[in-house]
């Protein structure tokens, strides 16, 4: 190991490890170098995988990966021969973005995305947001909820970083966004809190299909309030096609109209 380290230090022209009585520690320059070295090793592994493997690393924001994406993965893996594996990684939207930018993902489906020159992106689907209330809530029979009425309702908060906050800022405009109640960290926690009568919240309609069907929750539509879910993938070199699962999702989106 010491010989390899010495050779590397000779190549880069700086000291990477400093020895002392307490042991060896990386130098400041080594710490600055490590993220780049890690990225190069990851790129090397991805290049080998492209030659010998057929596994696609797909990231998904928590709500998308939990409530929307699974049937598409199943369909992709079962409707054609010689398709590779899908390594589905579900995380909070900011974490998915970080993994995508770091080259740890081949594609991602996200609740929001800031355009980047190294990536292609396309609208995957438009998902309505609904107000969820318990069946015995005063608004349970209200039907549709208009913006002016919605702004006065304190909301239970779900997962941070999902983009809902900025969406509400745009939607409510000069009215101001509704007051925030408890911040519960996930859509599942929000649903349980609403069922228990602790408040109301805004979620994607697909996240509460089962609860609405069973009568455990009531979902009230909100005109004009929706999320535009994005499909993102790294721009392929030359004229190569995007990853297979990306093509599958694009085809499904085109068929859906």
Go through each PLM region and give its residues.
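Short loop->beta-strand "edge-of-pocket" segments that line small-molecule binding or catalytic clefts
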Residues: 57-59, 129-130, 145-165, 253-254
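Alpha-helical linker/hinge and terminal dimerization helices associated
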Residues: 11-12, 33-55
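Hydrophobic hinge/microswitch elements
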Residues: 92-97, 101-105, 110-111, 163-217
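Flexible hinge/capping segments at coil-to-helix
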Residues: 116-155, 243
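Central regulatory/effector-binding core of bacterial HTH transcription factors
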Residues: 54-117
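A late-sequence structural motif
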Residues: 68, 218-257
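A short LG(V/I)-centered, amphipathic sequence patch enriched
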Residues: 7-26
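Secondary-structure junction motif
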Residues: 154-175, 239-247, 255-257
